[in-house]
Structure formats: C-alpha cells, structure tokens
Amino acid sequence: MQLRAGVHRLLFVFTVAAVVGVSSERMFWYWASAPVDHLVVAMVYAPAVAGCLWFVDRYRARGLWGLVLVAPLLGYFVEGVVTPVVYAGGPVPFFPVWFAAWHGMLGLGILLFGLRHLLLARRTAALWGLSIGLGVFWGVWSTTMWLPENVNDPELIADAGAPLTLLGPADFALYAASFTAILAGCHWLLGRIWLTEFVPSRATVWIWIALTGAAVIGWSVAIPWAAPMFVAGVALQQWGLRRHARHGRPSLLAELDGRVAAPALLPLVAIPLAAAAVYALAWELEPAEGLVRYGAMYGVIALQTVVGAVLLVRSFLSVRHVAPPPELGHDRARDVHADPRPLDAGAHRATGAGAAGARPVA
C-alpha cells in the first residue's frame, strides 16, 4: 500500500510539473521544444514543484494571497537551485520578483490552480476569456524570439546543438497546439490522481533539503551572495506562510479536489488559436525591432515585475493580523517545528488508504 501511495504521489508531482513546464519553458521560448522533450522538463521541475506543493499543504496556502506567498518559492527552487539565474542581478531581488510572476503566478497560479478552479466550477465563459488572454500573451511574447540577442544567443545555440531558426506562423501554430494538448491532457489526468494533501515522509523531506542545500552551496562558490539570498528569500516567504496558515481553513489542494470531464477542456483550444493569430499577424506586419524589444520583451518583463512586487507586498500585508484558529492555539501556531494544520488533519493523507485519489464532483 505504501508503494502504491508513493507511485501515486510521484505521478501527481510529475503531472503538476508538466503543467508548470508549459509556462516556464514552452511559453518562454520555442527552441529545442519537441513534445517528447517535455518529459525531461517535467523531471527537472519535479523536485521544485514537490517543494512548492509541500509548502502549499503544510501552510494551508489558499486564495490569491496564499498563492502569492508560495509563488516566489518556485522561482527560487528552479532558478536558484537547478540554475543560478536568480542570482544574476546581484543581491538586488529583481529576478526573484520577476520569476515569482513568471514561474509562480503564471505556472502555479494560472495554468495549474487558476485553470483547475474554473474547470471544476464550470465557469465556461471565464475559461474562454482566460484562454484567449493566455494565447494573446503567448503570441506577443513569442515575437521576442525574433530579436538578434535571442536567436543568436550562444547559450541557447549550445543547448539546441545547432543554429536557431525562427518558426513560421504554421509551425508556431502546430507548436502551440501541441503543448496546449499536453496541458489539457495533464488537467484531465490530475482530476483522476489529485491529492488533497501532500505529505512527504520525513526522510524524503531531509533528502530534498540536503540536495537543495548542496546545490545552493555549490553556486555560492562562484556567487558569494547566492546562499544568503536564497536563505533570506525562502525564510521571508515561510514567515508569511506561517502567519497565513493561522486562518485554519483547508489548502488549495483540498479545495480543488474533483474530476474534470474531457468536454470541459474545450475552451483551452482558444489558447493556441489566439497565440497563432497574434504571432501570424505580427509575422505579416513585421514590427520594428525596437517595438519588439521595448514593447513586447521589456514591456512584459516590467509589467510582470511591477505586478509581482505589488502582489507580494499586498500578500504580506494581508497576513499581519491573522489570528491563530482556536484548535491550534497561540503556542502551537508559533512553533517553528509544528505542522500548522489542525491536529486531526490527515484524513486524506497520501499514505495508505488516504491516497485513494481524487473525489468526483457531481
């Protein structure tokens, strides 16, 4: 039974990582992005995603502000552990804020929890609207691939193993449709393997912490501020999440349990249609290089960074006066080692019979 629960948990993490990878990698650029390669992306993202899911469950992250408090962690776990990109701007936290918006809010917030909320609530009109918005964003951002500094980037060329080529409108439409199909398939599967709680074993947690720490220390050899920046960033988010956990209500994992019928996924077809339409229009209009650079690329980065910073500040303000629920008590809520969930939590733990999977929604 424990083996079955472990496999279930791994499949859940892998599928969530595949969803997040669509935004974090496939929307970000389209080079070296064959659908079969997405398996590798999911495996690379899986440890970071597992860490975020653990934080969501442990600190009962729920609602917009709880999600915003978790969002920067995905950026730190991916771009500060797997790669050192988050430290590239020096101790100034520009990249952490931007990645909180791109990795965290776009990946975890919109593609995972946002779409799932709308799918389970059967809010078809909102789902169509969000899908169109995502498609327009994808199409606009993909025009930045045309910039010389991107298409001629030595690191990207080395990763691809060959000179980079621009996708024409037809090829881009196929590309967007392929990864939207993966996104839709993952949401259908998540409805059948969803876990209402994510509680890894103590050994798994310590292994994860050890590997994460080793990676950050490794980056610190060349980047002295890497370890202090990583520890400070994660500790700050954990502080906010600990206060957020005092609301005593179920986490997003518990709230978003349920199956998604295949026909309900139809509105997602608007994502590749809108993306392809915007990309094809830009291809025909041939906008000036400066417009693409300062409008599409720097404009999107600036907007995401500002929005990310505002949301982060607002999320910390939202937890200033959260009182601990009666069942926890003030002492337990302040105990750094205590699991902040209610004492009787665990009816749906991903161990034993509690890992039975998703609960159908009528």
Language-model segments: residues:
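Membrane-interfacial loop-to-transmembrane alpha-helix junctions, especially the N-terminal start
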Residues: 7-14, 59-71, 124-132, 198-206, ...
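N-terminal signal-anchor module of multipass membrane proteins
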Residues: 1-58
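Membrane-embedded alpha-helical segments in integral membrane proteins
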Residues: 16-30, 80-87, 139-149, 210-221, ...
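Extended, charged low-complexity segments
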Residues: 212-344, 348-362
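Membrane helical hairpin/interfacial module
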Residues: 33-87, 96
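Alpha-helical transmembrane segments
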Residues: 9-23, 74, 131-137, 206-213, ...
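Membrane-interface helix-loop-helix junctions at boundaries between adjacent transmembrane segments
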Residues: 61-69, 81-169
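Hydrophobic cores of alpha-helical transmembrane segments in multi-pass inner/ER membrane proteins
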Residues: 42-53, 101-116, 174-192, 229-240, ...
